[in-house]
Amino acid sequence: MTLITRRSFALSALATTTLSACGNGIGGSGSAVIDSRVDSTLNFMYNSYPGTRDLANNASGMLVMPVVTEAGLGLGGSFGRGALRIGSSTVDYYSATSGSAGFQIGAQQFSTVLFFMTQEALTDFRRSNGWAAGADIEYALQDRGETLRAETTTSLAPVIAVVFAQAGFRAGATIEGTKYARIIP
């Protein structure tokens, strides 16, 4: 009889611990933290790359990932959380995840902003269960003092990605193959 009581107690304790770890996140401060980081990231981007302000003004919406952490040693992956902004309002929160295999070593962090230049691209993104970044993205890069211009890049692709603020020791940053999924922070 004592064995059953101990077993029941152990199972009850395990079940209670497991259930207490399953919070739904509603009422937490996760969204406020993400919004604060998104605001800081946008201010940094606008000050460092003034041409991105034109992109933002012409975009139907922007997905801002303030910090994406990428690491690998043979197998690699990345993760970040951010917000979808339409105008100056946050409408949804998203996570970005990716995985890779091959010769790789190192870790880095970077910020990324996806500019949805057409309403159709924004609608497709919002309606998908999990949107994967692929060949339909145009990367806007700033090399040799050139400025980013919305007029020249808008016609190239419906989604424009800007990757900036890289820190770490891994060669290059890419969002290709990254899956974006809606979250409740």
In which residue ranges do the predicted regions lie?
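N-terminal secretory signal peptides and thylakoid transit peptides that target proteins
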Residues: 1-21
